A protein has these predicted regions:
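Short hydrophobic/Thr-rich beta-strand motif most characteristic of the beta2 strand and flanking loop
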Residues: 35-43, 50
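C-terminal output helix
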Residues: 119-128, 132, 136, 140
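CheY-like receiver
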Residues: 133-182
Length: 182
């Protein structure tokens, strides 16, 4: 069965990095891949403003060191629906500092993917494609809301797992219905 390539016409991206040259290079690469609706942010305050838009973005691609790591708290707040309109927003984090404790903190805030910098456009597009076609179910607890990263050793019954609404997938390969995400 042939599948159509993703359509990115309506996909909204927020690209957050404190370095203008990194944002610019990623924006050019994403534009070449067909992603045109890209907002840029250089601080967590600017990201927060983008998240509060009427429908909000479909993907947040962010440097996890933004504002001295404050972005981790913001992503956690997003996942717990304390900010933004869509707690299930696709989030791709980037880091230049892959120390174990920092990576653990980044994953624990609920990001979907973490890419080690320097970042190639191919890595970013591979993660976007993965979020469209293979996004894992989400664990929803009082302490953590985010992708299920556990190994399947406890059987089929997994309390707290939900299929997260995915506006990226809906816009790229399905029929987009904004009411599903209000």
């Amino acid at each position: 069965m042939l599948t159509s390539p993703p359509k990115f016409d309506d996909v909204q991206i927020v690209l957050a990095d404190p370095r203008a040259h990194v944002r610019s290079a990623l924006k050019v690469a994403l534009t070449h891949a067909g992603l045109y609706n890209i907002s840029q942010a250089n601080s967590t305050a600017a990201v927060r403003d983008n998240l509060e838009q009427s429908v909000g973005p479909d993907i947040l691609i962010c440097d996890m060191g933004l504002d001295d790591g404050e972005i981790c708290k913001m992503v956690s707040d997003l996942r717990h629906h304390n900010i933004g309109r869509n707690p299930f927003l696709c989030v791709i984090g980037m880091t230049w500092q892959p120390e174990a404790h920092q990576v653990t903190q980044m994953l624990d805030c609920g990001i979907d993917h973490l890419i080690l910098a320097p970042v190639s456009p191919q890595k970013v597009m591979a993660r976007i494609t993965s979020l469209i076609h293979n996004r894992p179910e989400f664990v929803v607890t009082a302490d953590y809301v985010g992708p299920d990263r556990r190994m399947r050793t406890r059987g089929d019954l997994e309390p707290g797992l939900v299929e997260a609404p995915n506006s990226l997938r809906s816009k790229a390969i399905e029929s987009w219905n904004h009411r599903q995400f209000e």
